[in-house]
């Protein structure tokens, strides 16, 4: 999915004003990437993954449920003898699932706090660096960012040269594969369908770049140079094999 920071708190407020009873926020990239404050957001339910920006292994996540007597009929879909003991207890044990990944969270917190400013410092630096790298790329390619820097988190959408001829979701997927196989670059590519009235030379492809503490400037130079080489070779997505 394309990346942009949306005003969740304001959207929840609008939902309340419009009479929406319950609001569920699916914030897959939230924790470790943007500020997360349940009381300020005001949603009834909020979930986020800790394996994306909080340095945890896959399957570590959390689900917040606002305390309310209205949710007494809310239950986990996979439940047995704990039925009726509350959502937290009902969700505590699901068959033979491996829960060892959750045990790393205390050590992850220790690791995060080794960095200057802890998670707040990491988020700030990630944002600053990804915007800097995004601006470097659009300057090199003569394109633009997909949204203003203030609407970026630790990720940013970077316009790709129009001459690459990205004209479908399939083209975007095949170009991503090409970058991985030929240049050792892994980056999500997204197709933006032209609006009515837009003509040739329009940016239709965007790359979603991200920045984490282990990234280096050379990673982004490698991506820049790979795209430049494709452009110099007069590459277009039409030349990619049809799979």
Model segments located where?
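Pyridoxal 5′-phosphate
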Residues: 1-243
